Amino acid sequence: MMLNSGDTAWMLISTALVILMTVPGVAMFYSGLTKRENVLNTIFLSFVSLGIVSLLWFLFGYGLIFGGDVSGIIGSHQVGISLINLGSASKYAPTIPEGLFAIFQMTFAAITVALISGAVVERIKFSSWILFIPLWFALVYVPVAHWVWGGGFLQNLGVHDFAGGIVVHITSGIAALALALVTGPRYDQKLMPHHLGYSVIGTGLLWFGWFGFNAGSALSAGSLAANAMIVTNTSAAAGMIGWILMDRLKTGKPTLLGALSGAVAGLASITPAAGFVDIGASIVTGLVAAVICYLAVSWLKPAAGYDDALDVFGIHGVSGIIGTLGVGLFAVPALNPSLTSGGLLTGSTSLLVSQLIGVVTVTVYTFVVTYILAMLLMKFKGLRVEREEEIQGLDINLHEETGYRLT
């Protein structure tokens, strides 16, 4: 198949959109939710994630994920930039150059790592985060991405993840939970957003960029991309309305933070399903994700006693699970030729079983490996800053900078 200029143009745009999601999207969304003494450090965690993962991706990440399968566990031993034939078509997307496919996939890895940082903001050592990034990327993201997208055993079992419900949201959410448990709670656990306006801008950039994230995962400009874009928007809208209603039921007043959280829950939940479900299913997915994520944040977290500071597990992890299982319920084969069977509502149970296997496998693997990795870092390096540094703020103590100079 020949390279297609229209598909190539769309994928160039989609790649840029997903980078925009990480910086400044995630960075601004997170920074607005923290105390003002930690705004720069919170932004820095996302920025440095993009930088480190961008280099690691072309050194070994791409080859070990997409360079050919070895026993269903990991990709080819061929690693490095030489593996990528920049001018030829990708075997995964035959109408775009392989180099473009490679950098598009790199953006997914970068945002996954950046998302994890939200669980441990305001207390993690910056130097420990720098060490965590390459270790977690190599030990968790790379194998999981190969299992699901690179011809690994989960893909061969029929697990479907259109744009990263498993690879991005479940891994980041579960890793965030494990890292938060090992790091321990902040001394002041109250969520005190210092500037919700930043979070509004960040959420807007996320919503905008998510069209590249999901519709771009069609890897071409056509009806599949159009469907993914539509259901992404409707799920985000349904999630936002769902969370507002939950706020209203519990407190009697809707909150802007709730609206932002619901929109992100809707976006995350439709990610694995965007290329497999119709508009009606996307609305149900977004609403269900909002309700369950609301309960995870407002009830499960305080009941269990963990300090996932910005609710990475409660929103991304839970939404990723809901959306992945939603594929097994609502998938419509007519929308995507890669589906060999539909969801449970079409009378088939096989896809739902495959999706459940994928969720359980990745959840357990991610939690165990991340927990062990965090424990090792805690033992040999230390994960969190000193009490006085945390109280005074990380911006001035770790970076000798301040986000605001008020005179």
Swiss-Prot record:
Pfam families: Ammonium_transp. It is found in: Cell membrane. One of its GO terms (cellular component) is plasma membrane. It is a multi-pass membrane protein. This is Putative ammonium transporter MTH_661. It comes from Methanothermobacter thermautotrophicus (strain ATCC 29096 / DSM 1053 / JCM 10044 / NBRC 100330 / Delta H). Coiled coil: none annotated. It comes from the Archaea. The chain crosses the membrane at residues 9-29, 47-67, 70-90, 101-121, 129-149, 162-182, 196-216, 226-246, 257-277, 279-299, 312-332, 357-377. Keywords: Ammonia transport, Cell membrane, Membrane, Transmembrane, Transmembrane helix, Transport.
